[in-house]
C-alpha cells in the first residue's frame, strides 16, 4: 500500500523537480516531474485535468491521449480536460517532435492515470476502513461491492491534489482488455 496525502492546491503550477530521475521527451532534456499532481488533478466535481507539453496540430493526439487516461484511471472521456502546451502549467516534456507523442506521452499518461487509480483505491480503503482488494474502480467512481457503497473520484479527493509519485513500475491494463483506448470515438474537442 502506498502512502497517499491530500493537499490543498488552488494554484497548481506543474514544473519539473530538479534532480529527478528520468529524461524528458524521450530524447534528452530536463527530467520529467515525478509528482502525480504535475500531470493530473481531480476536481471536487470529478473533472480530471491532465497536463502535457505536447501540441495538437491535426494529428488527433488530444483524443488518443485522453483515451489513454480514461482507460487507466478509469473515468468517462467526457470528464477529462487535457491542458496542452501551456508553458505556465504543463510539465517540460521535450516538445512535439519526431513522432514521439504516441510512444512516449501516451505511455507516460497511462502511468500517471494508473498511479492515480491506485492512490484513489488506497484512499477509499482508508475512508471506508475496508480491505483495498475488495474495491473496484470504474466510470469515475470507487465501489465496494460487498456493502454497495460507492464514491466518486472528486468526492474522495474533495478537489485536493494527490501527493504521490508516478510509478514507472505501475501495473498497466493490457491492450487485450482495453475498452476505450484504441477504439473509434468522436474527436475530443479542445475548446471549452
Question: What are these model-derived regions, one by one?
Answer:
Residues 1-8, 12-192:
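Cofactor-binding beta-sheet edge motifs in enzyme active sites
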